[in-house]
């Protein structure tokens, strides 16, 4: 990523300054008005906007929460550790994480040089990307369908290890740049860029990890464990009883 952009994203925000001065936790009112911790797009997006980027808040633990929008996290440098639906996800430089509205996320404290950027995205922003990726069924499309329709899909997050894929890195940096610097006429440009990003990611599905709800993940783990332990004499009836 361009060093000028890294320097801008690395600047200490007002929220981070308060944390460094001794505040031990996030201020929930910056993110939601609700009792439950559902991060609200209305707190982070200007009226009429479909997408925004903001640097990830460092130096503090971010407790378990969901979002009423789609969050895309890009790791610019360093690492961040996330617990998503009970699974540990460690983002390294160049990694990309998509979370839908059903993903439960917790974030461990990041250091000064751990720079991540969060895309706050309303589902309708992905309409162009959806139309660009065609009719073929795949987990990327399933994720989009669930996000666009608000369905409680099994695929609630997608994690891409794409640091070495130059076209992907260029497309992400282009979106961060145009949104962060508020370049004019950017909406259609960024919607098409997101579509191009998805088309590129379809070429690298071998670099993707997908995760569902914690309950589904645990069930699948138990199924695999049962098959491994009883691969000769196991039956579906016995498996059903164990489940």
What are these regions (language model features)?
Residues 157-162, 179-192, 199-238, 242:
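Short, Lys/Arg-enriched, Trp-marked, Pro/Gly-tolerant hinge/linker segments that flank
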Residues 1-79, 137-139:
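Generic protein-terminus/edge-of-domain signal
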Residues 4, 8, 12-13, 136-193:
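Amphipathic alpha-helical segments enriched in hydrophobic/aromatic residues interleaved with Lys/Arg
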Residues 86-101, 109-111, 115:
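Short acidic-glycine-tyrosine-enriched beta hairpin
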Residues 102-133:
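Ligand-binding loop in jelly-roll beta-barrel domains
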Residues 71, 81, 96, 106, ...:
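Short hydrophobic beta-strand segments that form the core of ligand-binding sensory/regulatory domains
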């Amino acid at each position: 990523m361009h060093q000028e952009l890294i320097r801008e994203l690395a600047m200490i925000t007002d929220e981070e300054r308060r944390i460094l001065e001794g505040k031990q936790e996030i201020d929930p009112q910056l993110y939601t008005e609700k009792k439950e911790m559902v991060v609200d797009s209305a707190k982070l997006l200007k009226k009429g906007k479909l997408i925004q980027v903001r640097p990830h808040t460092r130096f503090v633990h971010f407790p378990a929460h969901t979002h009423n929008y789609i969050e895309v996290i890009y790791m610019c440098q360093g690492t961040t550790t996330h617990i998503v639906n009970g699974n540990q996800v460690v983002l390294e430089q160049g990694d990309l994480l998509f979370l839908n509205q059903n993903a439960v996320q917790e974030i461990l404290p990041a250091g000064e040089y751990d720079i991540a950027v969060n895309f706050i995205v309303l589902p309708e922003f992905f309409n162009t990307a959806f139309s660009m990726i065609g009719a073929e069924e795949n987990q990327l499309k399933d994720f989009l369908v669930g996000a666009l329709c608000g369905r409680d899909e099994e695929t609630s997050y997608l994690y891409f290890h794409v640091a070495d894929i130059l076209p992907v890195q260029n497309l992400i940096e282009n979106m961060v740049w145009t949104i962060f610097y508020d370049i004019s006429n950017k909406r259609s440009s960024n919607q098409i860029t997101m579509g191009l990003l998805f088309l590129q990611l379809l070429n690298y599905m071998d670099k993707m990890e997908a995760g569902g709800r914690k309950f589904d993940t645990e069930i699948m783990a138990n199924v695999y464990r049962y098959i491994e332990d009883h691969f000769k004499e196991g039956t579906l009836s016995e498996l059903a009883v164990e489940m």
